[in-house]
Amino acid sequence: MRQQNAGSDDRSLLERIRRGDTEGAGELFERYAPALLRFTDRLLSDRASAEEVTQEVFVKVITRAHQYDGRAEVSSWLFAIAANACRDRRRRDRRAPIVPLEAVPEPPQKGEGIEARLLTRERRAAVREALDSLSDEQREALVLARYHGLPYSEIAAVLGISVGAVKTRIFRAVEALKARFHEGETTWNAAN
């Protein structure tokens, strides 16, 4: 029931945006910007690009609110716009490659040693690298399912594919990640 109320509330916000209500746009931004930023950051592996793309998503929402047809949840529509914007950004970046600056390390937790911080940073880098090794299609499906907890039916709506195709992409992504980490583990053990 709560899900249904959130959906109708999102639709009413979108209707307000269609009428030019900037407060409605602000409310939708506050509601979805954090999740969309996490999503775009996972897909792009570059925080600055992710922030730009997330802003672009909301500009598109404001200028294209009239194109929302109501067949999918507003959240699915937003994630679809974000996925398309990330694909466009990755295509553009492949033509003119840029090297993202490494993220500023998180401040150490009380009592945390340098070894623990380095290990955490290495693990994050390994996960990002592994996600980057997936195809765009696999990465999008996996990130929507595992990091954002969307059900397969909603992922299918976001990506414009069948539920079966979603399951296949996620299965193949997980298998590719398992193989990559197993390969890395073997290489790591051989080096020690």
What are these regions (language model features)?
Residues R18-R19, S45, E56-E73, R92-D93:
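Sigma70-family region 2
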Residues E52-V59, A72-N84:
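Structural recognition of an alpha-helix C-terminal capping motif at a helix-to-coil junction
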Residues A125-E140, L144-A165:
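Helix-turn-helix DNA-binding module
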Residues L14-L37, I62, E129, R139:
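A short, charge-rich alpha-helical start-of-domain segment used by transcription regulators
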Residues A6-D10, A96-T120, R124:
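Internal acidic/polar
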Residues T63-G70, A80-P100, T120, R172, ...:
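Arg/Lys-rich amphipathic alpha helix in sigma70-family domain 2
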Residues Y32, R169-A176:
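Residues within the DNA-recognition helix of helix-turn-helix
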Residues R2-Q4, R18-E27, L37-E56, V163, ...:
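Short, charged helix-capping/linker segments at alpha-helix termini
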